[in-house]
Amino acid sequence: DNPDHVGHKEGHDTPAYYHKLEEIDGYIGKVMNAVKEAGILDETIFIITSDHGGINKGHGGKTMQEMETPFIISGKNIKKGHEIQASMMQFDVAATVAAIFKLKQPQVWIGRPIMEVFK
């Protein structure tokens, strides 16, 4: 089960939802430890994000609580402890990943890389 399903079934901002987030946090820790054990931690960038916020059992919406999502980025050439000041949209995530890999964005993309996170 994933946090999205729990949020829609049990509700966002509920004990069940936060329990699921704690479970996911444990999985993230396992991935990070595996990357460290593989000796590639210094060459890795982690991105953790979500596709939408939520109120009650809803799916997105027009309020900030429903539209705002976390965007956590950490790793090689990423500023530590930086808080993004620019407005950011979901389609900027793909543009940021493209910038990490030095890929040219397709002309039709409307996203822009969040350059302020880079050292």
Task: Annotate each language-model stretch with its function.
Residues D1, V6-K9, G61-P70:
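Short, flexible, mixed-charge acidic loops at enzyme active sites
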Residues D1-D4, H52-I55, N77-K79:
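Solvent-exposed loop/turn segments at secondary-structure junctions
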Residues D1-E23, K30:
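Active-site His/acidic residue clusters
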Residues T14-Y17, L21-I24, M64, A86-Q90, ...:
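Solvent-exposed, acidic/flexible segments
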Residues K20-T63, V97:
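Metal-dependent active-site segment of extracytoplasmic phospho-/sulfohydrolases and closely related
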Residues G29, G53-G54, G75, K102, ...:
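Glycine-centered flexibility sites
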Residues M32, E37, E43, M88, ...:
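Secreted, luminal/periplasmic, and some membrane-associated catalytic domains
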Residues K62-K104, M115:
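Substrate-binding rim/cap in mid-to-C-terminal beta-strand-loop elements of soluble/periplasmic
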